[in-house]
């Protein structure tokens, strides 16, 4: 009787011989000849190894964006990883209230679907390059490998993969936490496949109910946002990218950032806070846009201060002139220390970011610009079609005050009629200008013993002080204006006297010659 050990030994020797013969065959036989033997060789290999493998890369080809299929598979496998895998990776979600376990690198688990057994492997490929790299992660690539028997090909390709993607996306929605993103400086990207955005959990409590603004204006903005979020088919019908632009303008402290948070909470969108000064050029700006997801608000705060779009040519020219006078060592030091310090994003690049071809990548995005000085912005940047809705965030009016009083003190007009009437007179009749931020600070209780009456009276005193301060500012401005006019008058007189002296001198010289 043949022993089992001898059987495995003979089988192993046969397989090794086949592999050796196949290698010689591929290397030395002409391609035309191999074409005739290829089907036979594949049949033989299939008989010995009847399994099929499908690879799902994290990044495919030259795409900048991470594969949605890869993400869906990762979410799907996390469902069973905790009970089947031996090596796990833990991630927190929803404010660290729960933990998601997923397969670690080089781990394998099994799955079953309609009686069909499959194997999933999580793999990471490390480049074998021996070159020293300051950014080793740039040479890594991750992928999932699915293995199944060839007899189950139809079930896997037509049913199982669709099941995995569908279930994975459902799990993604269930575990989704809204995030606040910030773009990383480009020198830290370490290759285009690295993280361009860092994020934290978005937990801002602002809502339209707590926003200090007139009720009618708030409802108008809310209706506009809700209409946009439900208009995918409409935007497709009219041939426009599914996006909308909002320009928030007004003095500091009028609630522009709070408005953005309220918008995100209303629509349950992520927020991308884009810092333009860290973006090197238009190409990097496009890459950042590609990495944003749908259902998101892309914010550029203080757009008038983010980039000097009008003065870049002069700055570049000055730098080129200075470069000739710089030694090679100094040039390299400047390059290492501040290569990305000066952004080369242009106005045309920013406009293309808003409504060019690249703005159509993805969908359901809101782009928000904020500024304290709308007059400083290029008209091309804020025209309708780019910034579709202009929202002025003004000083606190009486309607906005009532919202703040209710938020901070649970105070209502009918309960504190006299104090409310005085505040109404100061805000509407006296037209005293105070930002919602300053009003809120005066309404905030500073200790447990303070009552709402004390806080309301403190606000009244602050409004009266603001009135006096406004008068002083006007007087100072008038005084300064008069002083400037006096200086100009004296300069004109001095100029006139010098001119007369010059003419008199020339006249005397002419007389002496005669």
Curated annotation (Swiss-Prot):
Entry EC no(s): 3.6.1.-
InterPro entries: AAA+_ATPase, AAA_N_dom, ATPase_AAA_core, ATPase_AAA_CS, Mitochondrial_chaperone_BCS1, P-loop_NTPase
Residue positions binding ATP: 250-257
Main location as per UniProt: mitochondrion
Amino acid composition bias (Basic and acidic residues), ranges on this chain: 331-342, 467-502
A Pfam short name: AAA
Domain of life of the source: Eukaryota
Matches recorded under Gene3D superfamilies: 6.10.280.40, P-loop containing nucleotide triphosphate hydrolases (3.40.50.300)
Gene Ontology CC terms, in alphabetical order: endoplasmic reticulum; mitochondrial membrane; mitochondrion
GO-annotated molecular function: ATP binding; ATP hydrolysis activity
Tissue expression profile of the protein: Expressed in seeds, specifically in the embryo.
Location within or outside the cell: Mitochondrion membrane
Statement: the UniProt record of this protein carries the keyword ATP-binding: yes
Catalyses which reaction(s): ATP + H2O = ADP + phosphate + H(+)
GO-annotated biological processes: fruit development; response to abscisic acid; response to cold; response to salt stress; response to water deprivation; seed maturation
PANTHER family the record matches: BCS1 AAA-TYPE ATPASE (PTHR23070)
Protein name, as recorded: AAA-ATPase ASD, mitochondrial
